[in-house]
Amino acid sequence: MLDLAFRNVAILDGTGTPAFTGDVGVEGGRIAAVGEAGAAQTDIDGAGMCLAPGFIDTHAHDDGAFLRYPDMTFKLAQGVTSVVSGNCGFSAVPADPAVDSARASGGILAGLESGVTDLASYFDVVLARKPAINNMMLVGHNTVRAITMGMDKRAPTQAELAAMGDHVTAALEQGACGFSSGLIYRPGRYSDTEEVATLAAAAAPFDALYTTHMRNEGDRLLEAVDESLAIARTADVHLHISHHKSAGKANWGKVGDSLAKVDTALRAGQRVTLDVYPYTAGSGRMIEYFNLDRINLALAEVIRIASCPAFREFEGKMVPDIAQELGLTLEETVLKILTAEKGDRTICIQFVIDERDVETNLAHTDMMVGSDGIPDLKGKPHPRLFGTFPRVLARYVRERGVLTLPEAVRRMTSLSARTFGMQERGEVREGWHADLVLFDPATVNDEATYDDPKREPSGVAAVVVNGELAWTSRDGKGIHMGAGSGKMLRYRNNAHGESSTK
């Protein structure tokens, strides 16, 4: 007898082909039947709803969240069953007890424990928490640089470069799916192209990825794309461009030129993919966006405070409104926030992206979806943390028709699984891991807003992680089932396979 069966569902198998009606059966953590399914211990009637592979968040910062919030409600409620963490050059590993890696990340890695030193120990600690969803890891440039040479603004010595390379290789040997950089952030911004290419080349023997938050996403976007392509060519690795955008009103429309460069590289045989979040605002460490000697007033005008340990009362407010309340200029307000104790850990939201660019991005066939959510639940985070995947289905499929439903599901499932080496995931296929999401295509919607960013989405009826019912709903209210069935995923070309909670 099957453990679980979905009956009378519109099956979107993740390949981009049209939906077909049938049943899907689950047994022993795997998909046991597609089309017709026999008797099951638990039946779920999915008439009028779609069953798809669980969504894959290709751009997460959940390294520490798996320890602080192992229930991972903000992802599970969206139908996300797997994430890729360690992005933007910040990763949980390697870790050195003598170095505060949270300092380099501005608190993004908060929650890590002293027992974590490498990927294997990190996976062990996370699995002990019984995580709700699956996690795959990148190893971050900023992290290995901070551990090796601190926050020094200089080129590494040959010995330091070799030490960084050893850290990257060690993580890849233990199953990391690639090497990530965040070249807008310290200390990564102090590196030159050659340094990054040398470290990215460590991924080549593993056929792993180089993912990048590029050096510039605004005025010098096109030059940054050229650099990223050159790094990947030199290193002979697959390039994945994170949260592709052209920030700042003067740069709106440049995503078309940027994507043209990507297409040229693809035609030349280079391996390139991208991801995007479906919002017109970004979010990150506020300190990284300002030169304190010369405050960018135009940028300050469009910034909202998401998390501010120094001034919790500022959270959820725009900088101009804070300035008015305090009787300060914009410049004085920014300096007050950023120079306060723990001011460098302030997370802000910047309204700098054009809606038409979001649509242009989503229309590109190699574009995946990554939330880029920063899981700080104390403040008012960017709503993408809770809403990214339902927003794609509601706004860009149902309302705007930018993507067909089968194509949107492909971008959020099989394309992501294949790119990041998640073995036997990302499709509704017999014998594959049973990561599944049941949703109503007519009502699925992101409910999170900038004013109320922690609202769970609507229209997600059930989520299965590794064969166990992890999320369901009753009377429109989501219910976390506490399954704790998530696994730590190792890259497809790593002989060790997966780390399981079982």
Provide a role label for each language-model segment.
Residues 1-22, 27, 291-502:
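Active-site microenvironment of metallo-dependent hydrolases
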Residues 94-115, 122-123, 142-156, 167, ...:
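Polyanionic/metal-chelating signatures
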Residues 59, 183-189, 214-219, 244-251, ...:
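Conserved short loop/turn motifs at secondary-structure junctions
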